[in-house]
Amino acid sequence: MAEAGQPRALPTAFAPPPPLWKHFTPGNLKKLEEIKREASKGEDGKARRKDWTPAELRALDLSPELGFLVPPEIPTKGHYSVFGELQSLSTALPSLQEQGIEQLYPSPPTETDREAPSQPSRPFNHAYYLLKISKSLLLNFLEFVGVLSVAPEQFQAKVEDLRNLFINAHHLLNLYRPHQARESLIMMMEEQLKRSREEIEQMDKLHTEIKGFLDQLKAQGVDVDSAAESVSKATKKDDTSNKRAAEDSGLIWDILGEID
């Protein structure tokens, strides 16, 4: 029996943070900034703005407690640990055989099989095998219920069968993800192409309406070209007058400055 004064350990959903977080104090952060400022000074003695990399920070003369403030290098290969479990950096999906799990469906054709002209490979039908696994799950669940009603102590074998079926179904869905991503990209590009065509059609329609309106004005005796040239000349004249007014204003301010 535990002692009355001993605190009871409470289970948590997530692992506690590493103890190095205790070193992230305002004082330590200020010390690190001062060291970085001193190290970034140039020949003129002025500190220069610099983006420090973790390798450059480790090269500085830091105390052990300040060394915890330096971010680690980003792993590029191998494995990393998350809540005590090793995660691989490789994006390739490992096969069930590599994980020591029985595979209940045939392996999809590889690139080597597709390139072999003497052995043409059929496309892998994910939906067909997913349907077969789903039916097997229903059958094994009924058998599992029957085992529990007759001999409950022999449930372990059926639990393993159900577990293996679920793992195979999940792995088969993961194999289908590249195809799903490709189809989603195709749908997205088709939607963008459709919007672009609609915009082009609207622009063509507007161009036709404007051209018809101009033709109508010409038919009524309005010189559209001369009107456009006069508008352009008026705009240029306004720009010239505005520029001249700005120069005159600047000259007046210069004269006032000399008087002061």
UniProtKB/Swiss-Prot annotation:
A Pfam family: Med7
GO term, biological process aspect, one: regulation of transcription by RNA polymerase II
InterPro entries (UniProt xref): Med7/Med21-like (IPR037212), Mediatior_Med7 (IPR009244), Mediatior_Med7_sf (IPR044888)
Record-level GO cellular component terms: core mediator complex; mediator complex
Keyword list, A-Z: Activator, Nucleus, Transcription, Transcription regulation
Molecular-function GO terms, alphabetical: transcription coregulator activity
Region (Disordered): 1-21
Keyword set includes DNA repair: no
Subcellular location: Nucleus
UniProt superkingdom: Eukaryota
Biological role: Component of the Mediator complex, a coactivator involved in the regulated transcription of nearly all RNA polymerase II-dependent genes. Mediator functions as a bridge to convey information from gene-specific regulatory proteins to the basal RNA polymerase II transcription machinery. Mediator is recruited to promoters by direct interactions with regulatory proteins and serves as a scaffold for the assembly of a functional preinitiation complex with RNA polymerase II and the general transcription factors.
Family under the similarity heading: Belongs to the Mediator complex subunit 7 family.
Subunit description: Component of the Mediator complex.
Protein name: Mediator of RNA polymerase II transcription subunit 7
